[in-house]
């Protein structure tokens, strides 16, 4: 998984989707024979991001795969919204269970040399995601963003704070995306311009740059898609935290004491919310967050989607 094995192709989409041109290139690579071993593995992460055209291009090679090539498609579920029915029907399904917090904590202790206390806390609030647990345990900014997301449950009930809190949530996601992508984008642009002759002298250099406008625009398009993806992912993590916070309050309100909370470190605040809001209102809050995620998935502007969510949550908590 380090990306160094010659016969393992790991496809990680950086943009909002996996397009047909990218998939055709992958299929072409997969048609080659293994170079060092007996088998070649093509691992496609986030297969739910395949466009219809990309899914059709992949379907052809999945139906008649090259000799000794195995395709692994990773998707949240086998629901038609996550993976095309035609692809699903031609694949063997392997369900992966969510690891328990204890197992995640042990991974952090063994691999990251974290204290047992820090590892246990991060594992408990990570939602079963090892990478998220590691980020929360080691990155103070990630912990601050989580608290900001959970604070929206409180601020949404106050008219003077509600929309400002929503805008701050969107701004934080965009800022996180900029930090993650800006340095790479700058390096890519500089590398391309250098390859095209920028900074050079002599006959023809200016004309070469003028003729390369299409290549530069294509790079800018891919960079914009990558940053949008990073921003949407950051906002989605915040929304998942918020939804599970309301879920915890719903469990407490319903008296489901034997179920593990997603945010055990916020038990007092969750109990206070459960005492204030009955189950039907908490369910409306959860539906509002899930509705916001669905709106973002169909490219509604984040500000509009979050504002609508905040309005619904605020009304539910104030009624």
Regions found by a protein language model. Give the residues of each.
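Structural recognition of the conserved hydrophobic beta-strand(s) that form the central parallel beta-sheet
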Residues: 42-45, 58, 69-76
């Amino acid at each position: 998984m380090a990306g160094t094995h010659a016969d393992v192709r790991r496809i990680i989409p950086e943009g909002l989707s996996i397009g047909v041109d990218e998939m055709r290139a992958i299929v072409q690579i997969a048609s080659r024979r293994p170079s060092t071993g007996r088998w070649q593995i093509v691992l496609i992460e986030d297969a739910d991001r395949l466009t219809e055209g990309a899914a059709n291009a992949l379907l052809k090679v999945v139906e008649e795969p090259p000799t000794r090539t195995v395709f692994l498609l990773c998707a949240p579920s086998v629901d038609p919204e996550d993976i095309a029915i035609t692809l699903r029907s031609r694949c063997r399904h392997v369900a992966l269970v969510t690891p328990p917090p204890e197992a995640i904590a042990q991974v952090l202790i063994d691999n990251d040399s974290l204290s047992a206390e820090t590892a246990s806390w991060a594992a408990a609030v990570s939602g079963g995601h090892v990478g998220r647990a590691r980020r929360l345990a080691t990155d103070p900014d990630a912990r601050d963003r989580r608290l900001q997301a959970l604070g929206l449950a409180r601020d949404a009930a106050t008219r003077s704070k509600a929309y400002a809190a929503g805008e701050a949530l969107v701004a934080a996601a965009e800022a996180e995306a900029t930090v993650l992508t800006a340095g790479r984008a700058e390096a890519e642009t500089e590398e391309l311009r250098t390859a095209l002759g920028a900074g050079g002298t002599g006959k023809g250099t200016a004309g070469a740059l003028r003729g390369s406008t299409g290549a530069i625009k294509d790079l800018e398009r891919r960079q914009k898609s990558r940053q949008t993806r990073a921003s949407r992912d950051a906002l989605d993590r915040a929304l998942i935290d918020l939804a599970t916070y309301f879920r915890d309050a719903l469990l407490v309100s319903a008296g489901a004491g034997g179920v593990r909370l997603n945010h055990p470190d916020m038990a007092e605040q969750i109990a206070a919310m459960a005492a204030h809001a009955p189950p039907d209102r908490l369910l409306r809050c959860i539906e509002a967050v899930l509705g916001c995620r669905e709106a973002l998935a169909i490219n509604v502007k984040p500000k509009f989607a979050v504002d609508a969510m905040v309005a619904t949550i605020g009304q539910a908590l104030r009624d």
